Each structure stands twice: as C-alpha cells, then as structure tokens.
Amino acid sequence: MAIKKRSATVVPGASGAAAAVKNPQASKSSFWGELPQHVMSGISRMVPTLIMGGVILAFSQLIAYSWLKIPAEIGIMDALNSGKFSGFDLSLLKFAWLSQSFGGVLFGFAIPMFAAFVANSIGGKLAFPAGFIGGLMSTQPTQLLNFDPSTMQWATSSPVPSTFIGALIISIVAGYLVKWMNQKIQLPDFLLAFKTTFLLPILSAIFVMLAMYYVITPFGGWINGGIRTVLTAAGEKGALMYAMGIAAATAIDLGGPINKAAGFVAFSFTTDHVLPVTARSIAIVIPPIGLGLATIIDRRLTGKRLFNAQLYPQGKTAMFLAFMGISEGAIPFALESPITAIPSYMVGAIVGSTAAVWLGAVQWFPESAIWAWPLVTNLGVYMAGIALGAVITALMVVFLRLMMFRKGKLLIDSL
C-alpha cells in the first residue's frame, strides 16, 4: 500500500490497496516544470530559520562590539576570559555569548531544513527525514576513512562540505527515491506501520549515507574547494569578480531561488572566512531603495509621472523594507515592467556593491541592512556604495520608462 499525500484523491482497488487519482493537469507537468516549485517550497520554509538565526546573531554582535566596545579582532569568549568585565556588563557579555552560540546553531539548521522540505514537497512526509539527513551531511559531512601505507594505519580526514550544492542534489534525489519506493513496495495493510516507520526510513537513510559519502560530498566539495582556490589565488581581482557575481545573483530575482543560492554561497565563504559578505548585503538593499527613489524623482526629472498610481506608495514601502534588509518590496515594480526594472536594479546593485568592495568596505557578519551596519568596516564607503547603486537604479528606471512612454510602449494609470 502506497502512502499518498493528503492532496491526492484515494479510491480502493480490487485488492484492497489504495490508488491515487492523479490530477490531469499535474500529470502533464514535466520534471523541470515541477522542480522550481519543490525548490521554492524548501526555500520558503528555510527563510524563518535564517531570520531567527540572523537576528539573534545580530543581537550578540551588537551587544559585544557596539555596546560593550570590544575590539573587532577579539572574540566574545576571549573577552569573557579577559577579566575586564564585571557586574551588568559581564551579564550582557554572557547573554551575547549565549545568543552567538544559539544563533549559530539556528544558522546551521538552515540547509538541512531546506533539503528536508524540498524532499517533502517531492515525496511527501516519508521523504522528510531523508532530506533532512542529506542536508545535515552536506554541512557536516562524514569523516573520510583513509589508509596510510607509510604507517600501515587507518585514519580519518575531514572532507570539504558540499553545502548548498549537495543539499539541493540529495534532497531532489531522495525525494524522488522515496516517492518511487512508496509506490513500488506494496505490502498488506497490517504491515503498513512497518513500511512507514521502519522499512522506507531505513532504506532511504542507507541510500543517503552512501550517496553523500561516495558521490555528492566529493563532487560538491570539489566544486566548492575549486571556487575558493580560484578566488583566493586571484586576490583583489578575484574578490571584485566575486562581488559582481554575487551582487548580480542577489539582485536578479529579489529573494527568489537564485538569490537564496547566492546567499548560501556567500554565507559559506563568510563562515569559512574566505571572502566577506559585503557585496551580497549591499545588493539586497539597493533595488528597493533605488526603485523607491525613482518614484520620488521621476516628476522632478521629466515633468511626468512615469509610474502607475498604486506604485507610488509601494515605492515608499519598498524603501522602508530595504532598511530592514527585505528586498521583496521591489517585486511589484519588477512584475509591472520587468524590462525597465530588472536591468536597472541589477546594474545598480553590481556597480554599488563592487565600488564599495573596491574602496575597502568589509562586512563579515552575515546579515543585511540596519542589523549589520554597526559592524561594518569603513561604513562611510559602504553607505556610499548603497547610495551610488540606488541613484543609478533610480535614474536608469526613470529614463527607460520615459523612453518607453514616448514610444507608446508604456501605459501609465495616473489616477
């Protein structure tokens, strides 16, 4: 008996087994057509974990480095052991350490949560554990077993984690594997509990263990290690190219799957102290600020209102959300006129982020907007990069819309 998702309609067959009546429209969907929906399901469930971890981590950094004025090169534990803090300040520092530890744990669950819900979206709740295990192994891979012929001893070594690449691959493969096994392994009704609580979980866990150890971790780790080696070897040029790529990927879909993938790459490099997260954090806030600014300056520059009436209040909302680190406020502009909005905020994000990185702005803390600004090195340059990118975005979108309006390709409802 196959365990079906709740959304399926179940009818009893002649043998007493249940068969799902497939939605005709869903049956026409190809693998590639369904895949983005499954990935977005994982991303949407992962985001709260990232937010919780990020905000709690931000509290720890703000308390330690802004309020208590600990030097940036000193860790919180070192500050605790320095003997320089007592009374209320010591209590604050202990709370900062707790927040840092707890926030770090929450961040560590982001990728496993993503993988678990992608697998769940594909194969139902039976695939959830396999996805979670695979996601956890992508961030905390199993030690490699090696034989050293010089000492005639076995030893272990730590592989390079496959991170987001590995989590994405294993969640998809595990989801479809569990879905296939659930459909193909038919047992009598009285063995249903055995199938769901023992057989499928054990088989899927063994598969995840072998696939991650022998295939996915080596492959994903090789890609991640290669990228890091190239960027590190390239020095300043590599850092600027990385900034441009991360900024473009961050801005292109405003919180969508490409944005989230860029976030995992950036967070991975930042966590390992390979490259800072500066470009990504700047690119998050430039699109909504720039598009909001465009709704303020369009009439002053052109003498015309170039946006539909409902976009003007949304522009102000987008600017406010940008200071909270939320780029989705720019989505209405991208939906209303993608040909003018998307190129404008991508160019603005790339130029502003790259300029800030080139001029020496550095942010290691993996958050954006006001949550991280107190911890930025060269904050003036950092803010100048945001301003530059926002102005470029605003000017580009205004003049692109003006050109389209004059050519009759843009209709504006000014009511």
UniProtKB/Swiss-Prot annotation:
Origin superkingdom: Bacteria
Record's bilayer topology term: Multi-pass membrane protein
GO molecular function: protein-N(PI)-phosphohistidine-sugar phosphotransferase activity; protein-phosphocysteine-sugar phosphotransferase activity
UniProt topological domain (Cytoplasmic) ranges: 1-46, 123-126, 179-197, 259-276, 340-341, 400-415
Predominant cellular place of this UniProt entry's protein: membrane
Keyword Secreted recorded: no
Transmembrane segments annotated in the record for this chain: 47-67, 102-122, 127-147, 158-178, 198-218, 238-258, 277-297, 319-339, 342-362, 379-399
Domain notes: The EIIC domain forms the PTS system translocation channel and contains the specific substrate-binding site.
Descriptive protein name: Fructose-like permease IIC component
Organism, scientific name: Escherichia coli O157:H7
Organism classification: Bacteria, Pseudomonadati, Pseudomonadota, Gammaproteobacteria, Enterobacterales
Gene: fryC
